[in-house]
Regions:
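Conserved ABC ATPase "signature" region
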Residues: 108, 159-176
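Hydrophobic anchor residue at the start of the ABC signature
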Residues: 145, 195, 207, 223
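A short, proline-enriched helix->beta-strand linker immediately N-terminal to the Walker B motif
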Residues: 200-204, 220
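Conserved ABC transporter NBD signature motif
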Residues: 100-108
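ABC ATPase NBD coupling module
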Residues: 51-55, 109-125, 151
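Conserved ABC ATPase signature
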Residues: 181-185, 189
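Conserved signature/switch motifs of ABC ATPase nucleotide-binding domains
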Residues: 183, 201, 234
C-alpha cells in the first residue's frame, strides 16, 4: 500500500503472512556508480507512401539521464506508452538509441561492436513483463535456465547441471521442477524461472521491465521479496520499470 515506507530511507522486504523466520532488513547498497545514462534518445521511424520512406519519428525516449548505483534500485515510473520500457531496452541495446551515452562501469556501451556487446551482456540482463511469452513452451525449464550458460560456454555436463540446480535453489523453486514445462507452472513460478535465467550469467545489473505487474498482489509480494533478498545477497543493481507507485516505493533507493 502506498505510504507504508514513509520515514524509511531504504527498501525493505514485506512481512508475509504465514512465513516464519523471514529476514526483514533494509537494503542499503553503495554510493559507487554502476550505470550512468546521459541524454539517451531513442526514436522509431514511421514509414509511409508507396516507397515506404520515413515520414516521421516516434519520440520514445528523449534526452533521458540518470545513474544507478551498485547494490541499489532505481525505478523508472510512468504510464503505459510513455517510453520507460524503450529506455530499458535501449540501455541493453535491444533497440538501438539515436543519441546519448550509456556508461557502464566507465565504458560507453553504445560504442561497442557486436562481439564486445555480446561480452558486455554477461553483466547486464533483463526480466520481461510476461514470463510465459519469454519462455519457450517446448523446452524443459532446466534447459531454459541452462541456455545462457551454455551459449557463453561457461559450463557443461555435470557442472552445468549443478549450476542450474543451484539457480533453482536461489529462486526458491524445488529441484523437482527442473524437468517441467512452462505451462505446468503458475505465473509467479514462471517469473521465478525468468529471474533464474537472468541470474545465470552472474550479472551486475538487471533491468526489470514491469516484472510483477502481471501477477496478483500476494504473488507480487513474494517475487518482490525474492528480488530484494537476491539484491542483498549478491549486491545486484536493478533498474526497475513500473507504473505502480506502491511497488516502486517499496523496492526503490531512487
Amino acid at each position: 500500500k502506498l505510504g507504508e515506507m514513509r520515514g524509511k530511507s531504504y527498501p525493505e522486504p514485506m512481512k508475509l503472512m504465514g512465513v516464519e523466520n523471514q529476514r526483514i532488513e533494509p537494503i542499503v547498497g553503495t554510493d559507487e556508480v554502476l550505470l550512468d545514462v546521459q541524454n539517451l534518445t531513442t526514436r522509431f521511424p514511421v514509414k509511409g507512401g508507396l516507397l515506404r520512406r520515413t515520414i516521421s519519428n516516434v519520440h520514445a525516449v528523449e534526452d533521458v539521464s540518470f545513474k544507478v548505483y551498485k547494490g541499489q534500485t532505481l525505478s523508472l515510473v510512468g504510464e503505459s506508452g510513455c517510453g520507460k520500457s524503450s529506455a530499458g531496452r535501449s540501455i541493453l541495446r535491444l533497440v538501438e538509441p539515436m543519441a546519448g551515452k550509456v556508461m557502464f562501469e566507465g565504458k560507453d556501451i553504445l560504442g561497442l561492436n557486436a562481439s564486445e556487446m555480446h561480452k558486455a551482456r554477461l553483466d547486464m540482463q533483463m526480466i520481461f513483463q510476461d514470463p510465459f511469452a519469454s519462455l519457450n513452451p517446448q523446452m524443459q525449464l532446466m534447459d531454459q535456465v541452462a541456455e545462457p550458460i551454455r551459449n557463453y560456454g561457461l559450463a557443461s555436463g555435470s557442472e552445468l547441471q549443478d549450476r542450474v540446480a543451484n539457480l533453482f535453489d536461489r529462486v526458491q523453486l524445488p529441484r523437482s521442477f527442473m524437468r517441467r514445462y512452462p505451462h505446468e507452472m503458475s505465473g509467479g513460478q514462471r517469473q521465478r524461472i525468468a529471474i533464474a535465467r537472468a541470474l545465470a550469467l552472474n550479472p551486475k545489473l538487471i533491468v526489470a521491465d514491469e516484472a510483477v505487474s502481471a501477477l496478483d498482489v500476494s504473488v507480487q509480494a513474494q517475487v518482490l521479496n525474492l528480488m530484494m533478498e537476491l539484491q542483498a545477497d549478491l549486491g545486484l543493481s536493478f533498474l526497475f520499470i513500473s507504473h505502480d507507485m506502491a511497488v516502486v516505493e517499496r523496492v526503490s533507493h531512487q
